[in-house]
C-alpha cells in the first residue's frame, strides 16, 4: 500500500512539474513575442507635473527611472525657438542635486542645436536635423532634401492642394518641452497642449525618434517678388514606430492669413 502511494505521489509530482515547465515556457514565449512585436516599453514612470502643463512655456515635473527620482525645470520663449532645461536627481537625503542642463535652439534653416552641460561645466553641442527623413505618400508630393515643396495655387479660384507625407525627427535624450519644440518646428505648427501631450508620451517611452504621418492642405498667393501661404490646414498623426502601428496622438493646425 505504501509503495502504491509513493508511486502515485511521484506520478502526481511529475505531472505538476511537467505542467509548471510547460506553463513557464508558454509565458516566456509570450513575452518574447510581445517584445519583438511591440518596442514601446516605457522607461520612465510616475511622470507628475508640478508647475504648468505640457505645451506651456514654463514646466516643472518629476519622474522615476531605474529606481531613481528625477526633477526637470524647463523654460521656453514665446515661439519655442529656445528651450532651457535643468535636470536634477534626488539623493539619499531626499534633496535634489543638479546633474545637467540643456539648451535647445531651433534655427531658421530647420535644424537645431542641442547643448548639454554637466555639473563640471563640460559642454557638448550637437547639431540635429529635426526632419531626419521625409518621404512622400502620394505621387503629387515633391520631396526636396528633407522638406516638402509646395506648389503655387491661384487663390482667386479657391484652389486647395493636399499632399500627404511621412517623416521622423530625432529626439533622443531630450526633455518634454524640447521634444515639443522639435515637433512644432518639424511640422510647422504651434506648440500647444496637443503637441505637449504627445511629447510627454515620447519622453516616457525614452524614444530615439518621433514618427509622423502628415496630411497637409494649403493655398498660396503671389506677393511680389515671392509667393506666400495664405491658408493652411495640417492634420498630423504621431507614432512610436516607423511602421506606424502605435500612435501617440494627433494634432490639427489651421492658418488663415486672408484677413
Predicted regions and their residues:
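Non-catalytic propeptide/linker segments at domain boundaries
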Residues: 95-152
Amino acid at each position: 500500500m505504501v509503495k502504491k502511494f509513493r508511486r502515485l505521489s511521484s506520478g502526481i509530482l511529475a505531472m505538476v512539474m511537467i505542467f509548471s515547465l510547460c506553463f513557464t515556457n508558454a509565458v516566456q514565449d509570450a513575452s518574447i513575442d510581445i517584445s519583438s512585436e511591440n518596442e514601446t516599453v516605457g522607461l520612465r514612470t510616475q511622470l507628475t507635473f508640478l508647475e504648468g502643463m505640457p505645451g506651456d512655456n514654463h514646466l516643472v515635473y518629476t519622474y522615476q527611472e531605474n529606481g531613481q527620482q528625477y526633477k526637470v525645470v524647463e523654460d521656453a520663449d514665446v515661439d519655442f525657438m529656445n528651450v532651457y532645461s535643468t535636470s536634477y536627481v534626488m539623493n539619499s537625503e531626499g534633496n535634489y542635486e543638479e546633474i545637467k542642463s540643456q539648451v535647445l535652439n531651433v534655427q531658421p534653416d530647420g535644424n537645431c542645436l542641442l547643448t548639454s552641460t554637466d555639473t563640471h561645466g563640460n559642454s557638448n553641442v550637437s547639431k540635429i536635423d529635426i526632419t531626419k527623413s521625409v518621404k512622400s505618400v502620394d505621387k503629387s508630393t515633391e520631396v526636396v532634401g528633407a522638406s516638402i515643396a509646395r506648389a503655387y495655387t491661384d487663390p482667386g479660384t479657391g484652389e486647395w492642394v493636399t499632399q500627404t507625407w511621412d517623416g521622423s525627427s530625432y529626439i533622443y535624450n531630450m526633455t518634454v518641452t524640447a521634444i515639443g519644440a522639435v515637433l512644432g518646428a518639424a511640422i510647422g505648427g504651434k506648440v500647444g497642449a496637443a503637441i505637449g501631450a504627445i511629447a510627454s508620451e515620447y519622453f516616457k517611452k525614452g524614444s530615439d525618434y518621433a514618427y509622423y504621418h502628415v496630411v497637409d492642405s494649403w493655398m498660396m498667393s503671389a506677393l511680389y517678388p515671392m509667393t506666400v501661404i495664405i491658408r493652411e490646414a495640417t492634420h498630423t498623426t504621431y507614432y512610436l514606430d516607423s511602421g506606424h502601428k502605435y500612435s501617440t496622438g494627433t494634432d490639427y493646425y489651421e492658418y488663415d492669413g486672408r484677413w
